[in-house]
Structures are given as C-alpha cells and as structure tokens.
Amino acid sequence: MAAGCLLALTLTLFQSLLIGPSSEEPFPSAVTIKSWVDKMQEDLVTLAKTASGVNQLVDIYEKYQDLYTVEPNNARQLVEIAARDIEKLLSNRSKALVRLALEAEKVQAAHQWREDFASNEVVYYNAKDDLDPEKNDSEPGSQRIKPVFIEDANFGRQISYQHAAVHIPTDIYEGSTIVLNELNWTSALDEVFKKNREEDPSLLWQVFGSATGLARYYPASPWVDNSRTPNKIDLYDVRRRPWYIQGAASPKDMLILVDVSGSVSGLTLKLIRTSVSEMLETLSDDDFVNVASFNSNAQDVSCFQHLVQANVRNKKVLKDAVNNITAKGITDYKKGFSFAFEQLLNYNVSRANCNKIIMLFTDGGEERAQEIFNKYNKDKKVRVFTFSVGQHNYDRGPIQWMACENKGYYYEIPSIGAIRINTQEYLDVLGRPMVLAGDKAKQVQWTNVYLDALELGLVITGTLPVFNITGQFENKTNLKNQLILGVMGVDVSLEDIKRLTPRFTLCPNGYYFAIDPNGYVLLHPNLQPKPIGVGIPTINLRKRRPNIQNPKSQEPVTLDFLDAELENDIKVEIRNKMIDGESGEKTFRTLVKSQDERYIDKGNRTYTWTPVNGTDYSLALVLPTYSFYYIKAKLEETITQARYSETLKPDNFEESGYTFIAPRDYCNDLKISDNNTEFLLNFNEFIDRKTPNNPSCNADLINRVLLDAGFTNELVQNYWSKQKNIKGVKARFVVTDGGITRVYPKEAGENWQENPETYEDSFYKRSLDNDNYVFTAPYFNKSGPGAYESGIMVSKAVEIYIQGKLLKPAVVGIKIDVNSWIENFTKTSIRDPCAGPVCDCKRNSDVMDCVILDDGGFLLMANHDDYTNQIGRFFGEIDPSLMRHLVNISVYAFNKSYDYQSVCEPGAAPKQGAGHRSAYVPSVADILQIGWWATAAAWSILQQFLLSLTFPRLLEAVEMEDDDFTASLSKQSCITEQTQYFFDNDSKSFSGVLDCGNCSRIFHGEKLMNTNLIFIMVESKGTCPCDTRLLIQAEQTSDGPNPCDMVKQPRYRKGPDVCFDNNVLEDYTDCGGVSGLNPSLWYIIGIQFLLLWLVSGSTHRLL
C-alpha cells in the first residue's frame, strides 16, 4: 500500500513539473511548447504553400484540360498483355533453341571421328586470341580466323556477325584430338546461328556448351580485351555456368559424405575441403544438398540437419563448415552410409525429389559396406559417386565397387589439378536418363537471373540439352547412346523484358515484377546487384551492363520477392499463388521503403498477377491508388509543340528556370546522355528536325514531356517570377511524371543534385505517398556540402481531380535557407520573460536541447550550432540514449532490412556472414593454405607449361602476377543490413523522463501538423551522461538472418514438373577407374606441389 501511494505521488509530481501552468516551473508546460510548435508549423506550411505555387499548378492543369485526356490504367488488362508479350518473346527464343539443338544432334551423328587432322584443316576463331592478330599462333591441325569487329550498340562491345567464336577452358589443350573433333563438327552450327538471327534480329548470344568444355557462341566477340585486363588468368568453364548446370541434368538431392578419419590429414584433408567446395559450385537453386562427415561416427558438418536448398547462403554455410573439419579416429563406412541414406531418404522436408546422390570423399579403405547398400539401396534408386583423394597405397577396389554397384562413378583426385574436372563430370552420368528419355526430355528451361560473362548485364537463359543420337551396336542390336553432348543456350536480356513492361504511365511508385518457381525475382525495381571486382561503384548497378566483370558473376542473382520488398502475410500469400501459376488481385496497405533506403512510408497498393504461359514465370503489376489513371497529352498542333519545346532550350533558363529532362528512350535515333545540357540540346535539335509523331519516336512520351514543359513554364512565368524574393527561400522547383524538373532561379538549378529521372527520385516518390509537406535534409557528409549550402528541401504532391478521377502528376517544393530557419526557430521558441535557465530554446543553451527531426529520425533543425552542423545526420548518432527511448515508447518504430546484393571490402563482412549472391570467395586462410585461386590457376599454368615444352608460346596469355592476385580479391559479395525508422502511431504529443541511472532528463515532443516533422525539447545530454552507444541507421555489414533458423521454415517453392533420374535402359557398367598414374602424370604432380609450395611461401612473406 505504501509503495502504491509513493508511486502515485511520484507521478503527480512529474506531471506538475511537466505541464504546470506557472512560469516559475523549471520546464516549459506542454501548452507552451504546443503553442511554439503550432506557430512553427503555421509559418513553415504557409511559406511552402505560398512559395511553391502548389495551388497555382493545380489551376494550370484544370485550365488546360483540352490539351490532355485522362486514361485508365487497367491493371488486369496491362499485366495480361505484358505477360503475353513476354511469352511471345521467350517462345521465339525457344524456337531458335530447338533449331540449334536438332542441327547439333544431326551434324554430330553424321560426324566421323578422326585421330589426325591435316595442318590448318580446322578453321575457327579463338575468342581468347589477342586483338593484335600478329600475336596469335595456331595449334597443329587448326587455323585461326581473324574477324573484323565493329562496335555494336545491342551488345555494348565489339562484334562480328560473320563468324562465331570459340572459348576453350585454360586447362584444356586446344590442339587435342577431342577438341579438334569438337571444333570440326560444331562449325556447322554457325550457319544456324546466322539463320536464327536473320529470322529474329533481336537475338542476343546463342551458345553451345559442350560436355568437353568447349563453348561456341555467336556472334563472335573477343573474350577479353587484354589491354584492359592484362596478365589475367581465365578461369571460365562453360560447364560451370548456371545455365549449363540446369540444362545438363534434372534437379538433384545430394548428400556429400566426407571421410574425416585420422588417415585423412595434411594435404589430403585440404584437397577434400577444396573438392567439396568445388562440388557445391555445381549445384543450382533447384538442387538440395547437405554435407556430413564420418569416422567411427557420423554427423552433419554444419547446423543443417537435413537437405537444404543449394542457394548461395546455404552453400556458404556448408563451405565454412567443411573448412573447419578436422581428421581423427578410424573409418567406419557403415556408419557413414547409414547416416547418409537415412538423411537422403527423409521425405518430410523440402527437397528436389529427383536425382538422389551420395558423394563420398575419402582416401580409401578396405570396407565395402555391402550390407548397408543391400538394406537401403536394393533398387539402386540412389547413385553413389566415390572420390579417392590424395596420394596413398590403399586398394581402390572397395570404393570403386561402391560406385559401380550403385549406378555411380569412381574418380581419383590425386592432386589439386584434378579437382575442377572431376567434381563436374558426374553431370554426364546424371544426364544418361535424360538422353535415354529422348524427346520427352527436350524441354526448354529458363534460368534464374545472372550476370552475363560477356558483359551483357542481367540476363536469363533458355536451355535445351543436346543428345548424342549415334546408335551403338551390340550383338546386332541397336542400342541408344546415353551420352549428353552438351547444352544449347540463348540469352534474353532483362532490358528486353523491361521494354515489354512500360512504366511511364504507371507513376513512379507503380511497377511490374516477375518471379520464378523459387520465388526469386527476375524483374523488380529493387533488383540491382552490384558488380564484384576492382573499382566497385558505390551505387547500385543501373546500367545495362556493368563495367566490372569477374568469375564470381557466374552465380545466379537470387533475390527473393519477400527480400526485395518489406514482407507481410499478404505478400507471402501473393508469392505462393504466383508460384502455383494462379491469377489474382489484392489491395492492401503496406510499408514501402524509400528509393534511398532511409525512410519507410505507408501506402495502399493493388497487386495484380498472372502466369506467363509456356514458362514457369509469373508476372505482377503493382499500382498505388493515385495511379489508376494517367495523363495522355494530345498536342496535335505543331505550334503548341514548338512553343513548349522552346522552353527547354538552355538560352531560356534565366526566364524559365534551370530545366532537366529525364533521360528516356524518346526516339530510336536520340542518344541518351548523362550530361543534361547535352541531352537537352540533342533533344531540341531532334524535335526541330523531326516531329514527335515520327515513326522512330514514342509520340506519347515526347508529347507528355512537352506538355509538362509548357505547364511548368507557365508556373514559372506567371507565378514564381512575379513574386518578390521571399526571405528564407533559396530555390523553388517542380518535378513531373512526364520527366521535367524546373529549378528557379537558374543559379539554384546549377547546383541541383537530384536525379533527373523523376521515376527514380526518392523525394519525389515519397511526396506522392504522403499527403503532408515532406521535409528532407541533405545527406550528411562530413567532407561534402552540408545543409547550409544546399538548404532543406520541402516538397508536396500536386493532387488534382479531373471528372472525379484522382491524379498526382507532379510535385512542387522549395529549398529553405538554414540560417533563416534557425532565426525563426529560436525566435518562436524563446520565452520572455524567462524565469529560469531551462524555460526556452535559447540558442546554444547549456541546459536545453531543442531539435526538429523528420519521420526517419534525421536531424533537420536544432538550437545548438554543433547540432546544426550535423543537419541530415541520423539522431541516433547524435543523442543515442534519447533516440532509443523514443523507439521504446513507440514514437518511432523501426524495420531492419537486409541487402543481399552488396559488396564489401575483404574482411569487412562478419566472419560467418553469408553473401546472398556470391560464388565461393576465398578467405585469407584459404590463401595461406592451398587457396582456391592459386590452385586453379597454378594447375592451369602447369598443364600448359608442360604442353608448351612441345608447343612453344602456349603460355603467352596466362601469366599471373602478385598484383593481379591481390586486385582480384579487392571486393567480395556480402550481406548488409540497414534500419529504417518511421512514426509508429498517430499520437501528436508525448512526454517522459529519460532515466540514465544517476540522473534523468525530462523531455516533451510535439508533431508538426501537415508535415513529417517532430519537435523535441529535452534537458541537454551534457547535463546528464547516459548511454553513448551509437544507434546506427546507415548500411553496415551483417551476418544476415541466421541460415540455421531459416532452413527450419523454408519458403514455399516448386521444382520442375518432370524428373529424369532413372531409366531401365541405362548402361551403368562404365563407372570409372583408371589403370593408375603414369610417370608423366606423377612428374606433373611433383612440379605442381613444388610450385604450390613456392606460391604459399611467397604469400606468407607478402602477408
């Protein structure tokens, strides 16, 4: 009872301190503070409304309704038309694939194998030839073509349509009999390549990837420009590309079983670790995998206790775990295989439900574990592949028997150089049932999104397997061949798909997106992977092709729809329905992350979706309520067109304001430029020469930009220019859907930093989703211009109703001078007379902090000079204890989101971080041990070095220097996290006491009506030391969500509808095993280890 009375007394005293009416109290009353805030709000809104001319622009749109019509955005109709267009595009590409595959099978069947070729008999263009033809030599039996290249805008590189190009992996000798035969028969594909292009000039890369590693692609283009990337080792192998892996075999359920007994130690253990990592790289997102180790007992190597999807994050977890395994104990194959079969046959978890495989990596042993195979695999539905790793004297018989008796294959990995080739050849075995199935397996598949190796940017690839249809005769019976020749592929750029989903009538917050059966997006405005390599840009990739390419681009860009947006239950439902191929529509309120990823807004969105027939993709259209209609200009009179276009000329900037035009594809012949002045000149010159209705132009786009140019010019001429200079206003601006940005006066426009593409302007998109005036501080940059130079931006969407239809065609605003605002701010919040030291917001007060924050928690105004120098900075870095308390009392809510498309400096990412879209990234520890780069590169050099003893000059293109090695690791894929803060409720006032242990700080806050601002008055942090741990909003490296938890509740997905994993006609007697290493190979291995020792030693010295 006494405690209750004490609590009541304490609360009463606190309330009297905070809201007591007497001017004698130490803290201003809530009524007083609200009166200050109401005056600030009135002054700010009146200033913004008057200076921006928001009402005047509404009047202009209403006045000139005869110059435009209001057209509906019928979401269902739009999404179905776009889906049909995408279906047609992919169908045309599929026809090209079928023609190529049929011709390849026909030509190869007629090809006569030859052991010898006459000099210069095989003619081809080697894509890795130096651009200087004098530096190229042909191998015996072949002759090099020297194409004439031209720069091609479609590919963004040098192209020859007269020839195809051939890429041969570095570790394959191009003069070998196998390669010469492949070159010989695949040359017939060139005519089909050309015919396909004649029928469809929009075709991009057409590629045949051979099971031998040779890749023939059309049109011809140099693989690399050696002047840009000198002395770089080429590690590309077509058989490791995601599209080849997907096309070569049906999905896989793979259990990798690793022997960690005491005999597996030293170099053998290191070889196993690297082999398992390489094996994991042969898996795609349609596959499922886990890794287990065994000695006298068996266990999972990681936290995964069952098969998991072979996406990049999960494979990274497994690789990290494998790198930490140690060897001890004795080998018990029975325990290992029992564990593997139990897990592989567990159907209670998500899995591929197709090829079931056990991959055994061991140094050998005497046990066959026959009873285990009899128990679990009598019907041989599980294939067993065995790998004898390292140099040892064990009898290979037992582990070879395991493979042969279980429809698998036996491989030997005696050294580093054998890893890459032997960890990918199992795909040939898995391809047997597909070949035997014949036409049933001839189904075009479309891949996930990935970065094209030849710098085309983001692409998807249609694939079709190519079979060896040559008959084999045994006992006078014609047996079908079961060898896969390779995979045919045709690329489709995402830019081509985007062109079928026009965006410029949807408003900036409307967009299309598409997903595949894994739920990964192939089309989405937030699909912006950052290229990995030297000199990484600091912004997201927006161009068609990145400037940097790297072997890591082989990995698909797997961004889940629920990671591309802010997840909620309705979006989960939409994703599931899209994967199931259903059509539907949902309208709901959702959180929306801003373009600059600093803010979160709330808005109503309508999602409309439909399947893309003939594919596994599904397409959706997202529209806010204010984009159900759009403006279509009807500038039929050339006089009006000319008058409006005149306002875009730089000579008129003094009168019309500095003008920007969005860089869009207005006309085919109009070159887009990043230089606004240059682009405007080109645009005006083009319009002067050709009318907007020219067949090469998009008349709707041009007429809309001209309409907006005219309307915004009238705002400048008839309103802004007639106003006297308004104190505190540095600039006025108007931005439109049509792509016009006008900044007045001209001088202010010369320092304008916003994106001229209005559809990608963060403040513009935010203004559309908010009914209030949106205040935005410039980015805080210690070394760059601050708020004093650029001012505070205030923006408001122009809202009009035409015949009852809501439109938001533009945003107007001003930039406020910081000094003027400070003067008004302090004047408004000064109390006279002031009876105590804490009764008002005196400038640079020692005892009182007064700040204005925006809805994201960024500082916009303060009564302290050291604060105002930090305008634009997140308040959690300025006063972290207060910001934490504001979150705790629900003034602010927050959302933590992850970016799986980031790149980081090596070592910057957390140790256990999992990059969402990386290929295997070698760590420093890897380099110090064997090193992925060093192994692959060293083996390639050694192989070709020994070959060059017979064929001089072979090594000329494969030199490697320490600087190149270091530079290649300058960036790596990683996950970053960022936290966005937003107002959590509609409460306008709040008060409290911030308890800091030995002291406390009273505070009171008020939101400014019709704005996104909040005023806070608080006792200075200098008077009461508190928690100083910074609260970070900015992007920072992260482990991401715990993958061990994520696999327990995997997201819904669907695998391919068909599976080719077994066939009764399969001949599995060819199951591997060689007669041992001949002396020359032992010699190669000896030199290889010597080189690796030298590389390792020099690396230690460098580090």
From Swiss-Prot:
Q: Which residues form the signal peptide?
A: 1-24
The sequence motif named MIDAS-like motif is recorded at 259-263
Tissue expression notes = Isoform 1 is expressed in skeletal muscle. Isoform 2 is expressed in the central nervous system. Isoform 2, isoform 4 and isoform 5 are expressed in neuroblastoma cells. Isoform 3, isoform 4 and isoform 5 are expressed in the aorta.
**SUPFAM superfamilies in the cross-refs:** vWA-like
Main subcellular location: membrane
* Phosphoserine found at: 119
Q: Which residues form the Cache domain?
A: 446-556
Q: How does it sit in the membrane?
A: Single-pass type I membrane protein
Residue positions with a glycan: 92, 136, 184, 324, 348, 468, 475, 604, 613, 675, 781, 824, 888, 895, 985, 998
Record note on quaternary structure: Dimer formed of alpha-2-1 and delta-1 chains; disulfide-linked. Voltage-dependent calcium channels are multisubunit complexes, consisting of alpha-1 (CACNA1), alpha-2 (CACNA2D), beta (CACNB) and delta (CACNA2D) subunits in a 1:1:1:1 ratio.
Q: Family per UniProt?
A: Belongs to the calcium channel subunit alpha-2/delta family.
Q: What is this protein called?
A: Voltage-dependent calcium channel subunit alpha-2/delta-1
Species this chain originates from = Homo sapiens (Human)
Q: What is this organism's lineage?
A: Eukaryota, Metazoa, Chordata, Craniata, Vertebrata
